[in-house]
Amino acid sequence: MKKLSLILGFTSLFAIGHASLSPAITTDTAHWYMEHSYDVLQYKLAVDLYANYATPFPKTFSAVENITFRVDSSLNSIKLNAIGTSLGIDVVGLSAVSFTHANDTLTLQLDQTYNPGDEVEVEIHYHHLDVADQGLYVSNGFVFTDFPPEGARKVFPCWDRPSDKATWDLTAKVPVSVRLGSNGLLADSTIVGDTLWYHWVCDEQIATYLITWSSSNIWNIHVSYWNNIYSPDDSIPIWLYKKATENVTTAVEKIPLLTDFYASKFGPYPFTKIGFATVTSFPWGGMENQTMVNLRPNGYTDEPLIAHEHSHMWFGDMITCGTWADIWLNEGFATYCAQLWLEHQNGYEVYKNKMNALANSYLSGNPGWPIYQPEWAIQTPSANDLYNVAISYNKGACVLFQLRYVLGDSLFFEVMNSYATDTNFTYKCAVTEDFISVTNAVTGEDYSWFFDEWIYSPNHPYYENVWEMEDLGGGQFKVILNMNQTQTNTVFFKMPIEVEVDFNDGTDTIVTGWNDTNPQILEWIFNKYPSNVIFDPNRNILLKHGTTVVGEREKDPSGFFLYQNTPNPFREITTITYATDIDQYIVITLLNQSGKTLQTLVDRPFNRGVYRFSLSGENLSPGVYLCRMDAAGKSRTIKLVKR
């Protein structure tokens, strides 16, 4: 009877009465965000894929979609995303009485005006056109979908934004040889002759870009279980879709251990299934479809990839970025979680080396924009920009590393756990300000300054630090660190710092301080002779340039210093830094190579401190110049090169 009822149910989806209009279809793509005055509760799709697994492997299919939504404000029509070059709308039914399809927007006219709180169901009969659209992939017996960031609209009409989650129900008709997986749990599968119907149900809320089906007529399925550490009587199935020749040993061994580890840090595994599949012609390394991760071919041997994608079940799937401006809450978190797994398995040094590599990758590939781009909350960027590895992945992960350094391990992991288990966000969405609020609530302090620097501002600090030593007599020595951030295209970065002081007896020590003004002098007194100073010896500030202290300068009775300009050589502008340890009058002049004064740059009294100014090269011809600092009857000179 179950078999019969499923067949009749599937047939009825394709046979309901409906209204029909001739749609106006255009190839234009809508880049604006549509009016949205409803909340989608469920997408229910019945799709006929039977013909897609054999030559010539067509990309066409027919489908019936039922969408249930709750009204937020009175309406008599709704708009959905539906790409006109991919989808042809045939007829609509239930509460939808007519439609227009233009500019990649499907507008459904409803049978009446509905009021806030009303639940409405519409039905859409449509077909997918025989086009390659980077949403549906069909080749050599593989049929799968891949939707990030907004590709679901190429396969089924939807409101295709990450902030509106819904449940998912899929019934798929395929040849009996096909293995097909989707989000959630397999509710039923029925074979009649050479035809197989799969019925997948995802009761947890899911964003449209995380919806998928993956299938192949050459797959085997390896099923194992994770013993739920939070509910030992409930085991979670692990479904691995694979070619017969693929080795899944690493995945079978590591996925339960990964789940244990992430659950211990971030709370219970949030779903009822763990699923992975390897697919051909895949455009990414992996895609974190909710409970049904797609991997590149042979991805089962790639432990870091599996660790990254599996952590998305907490960060990205259970808690989804509320806007694309918050994508780092998905990708930065998953990138960092994979390194936490590395630390758990192999120790801190291995983890730190990998974090250094991520930081170096960012520093060499930084495109110059901040992690949080406000316009991305309104206008979807290109996939290349949104998924920029340097920013969304590597810098995002490094920011979490630095937050751990600032907070300390105990508070940091409390923040992460509190965020991951907060019912305001679980199975919903979160934005960057939500994570900041959790950080502030857990710590009892306001860390907005940290996120203002590292998330909302572009780039990173450039340090030009100089240390000096003063013999105080009586076996006492003062180390003076003149700190100077020279970046000109972003903010000042306030951070706690560590400084290693090496002594001439072969010993060393680490001292700490706060770099909270620019420029700044920090001092420490020791009872043995300092021989060297190293700024940030453990590279806790991953995201920076100029980590090497410029040099050692012993105290001079005149008590003033002129440091080499940066950059040098220069074209448009260069920064000149100077310092005085006593209150005195200072004159700085620019000269040509013959010693003729061209310009007086500084001429006034100064209090003790470190100072800097910018010198424009606009009116300087290319060549070599001298910059001289005069005070207390003595002078210091540096050489400047103008390109």
Segments predicted by a language model, with ranges:
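N-terminal, polar/Ser/Thr-rich
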Residues: 18-63, 70, 448-449, 453
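Glycine/proline-rich low-complexity spacer/linker segments in large multi-domain proteins
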Residues: 28-37, 116, 125-169, 224, ...
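Hydrophobic helix-coil surface modules that form long, contiguous segments used
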Residues: 63, 159-307
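A surface-exposed beta-strand-loop module
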Residues: 83-140, 523-526
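Zinc-dependent metallopeptidase catalytic helix centered on the HExxH motif
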Residues: 163, 294-356
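Acidic/His/Gly-enriched intrinsically disordered linker/tail segments
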Residues: 331-398, 402, 406, 423-426
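Amphipathic alpha-helical substructures
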Residues: 389-481
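C-terminal outer-membrane/trafficking sorting elements
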Residues: 556-566, 570-643
